[in-house]
Amino acid sequence: VMKHAYGETIIKEKPKKIVTLNWNNADSILALGLVPVGTSKMNWGSVTSKGLLPWTEAKFKELGVDNPNVFNDLDGYDYEAIAGANPDIIIAPYSGMEEKEYKRLSEIAPTVPFKDVAWKTTWRDQLLEASEAVGMKDEGEKLVEETENFIKDNVAKYPNLSGKSAALCYIDAAD
């Protein structure tokens, strides 16, 4: 059972066909070594001709998929295309999914939207929620630990960063 902003989603068995919607959610699933049967087109950053961020496309290729199923949901979810992927689960812990969208997507497959506040899920929670939803909680916890250690080890190489913080923003002409 996954608790979230719109209640809870019951996942009866480990999903095999996973759809990821909105930003970055495919990355969590791919990091677990799973391949989404469909994912959202990216609308920020330097995207590839397939509509993915370069590292996302590279991970798809590493996992044997040269032409992933990418949904153009920039103006709203493409429910027909999502249903056409025949998912066992829809994952979107980092999203701005509205309740009416959640209800409609839940008619297609069990859906896991953001837990508390739209677009506020940290990378850690995004990975942990996605890994729990697909029955790989331990693997997700291990990935978080490995990533935190990677960050810590690399920041330690630059002592002048001690006590500093940073903000990253992406702004384009549409903003």
Protein language model annotation of sequence segments:
Residues T39-K41, I91-Y94, P113-V117, K137, ...:
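Short beta-strand->loop
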Residues Y102-D138:
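Charged, glycine-enriched surface loops/patches
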Residues V1-M2, Y6-T9, P15, T20, ...:
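Extracytoplasmic/periplasmic mature domains of Sec-exported, cell-envelope-associated bacterial proteins
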Residues A167, A174-D175:
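A conserved mid-domain beta-alpha-beta active-site/ligand-binding segment of alpha/beta enzyme cores
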Residues V1-D27, E139-C169:
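Bacterial Sec-exported substrate-binding components of ABC uptake systems
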Residues Y79-I82, N86-A92, P110:
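Proline-aspartate-enriched helix->loop->beta-strand connector
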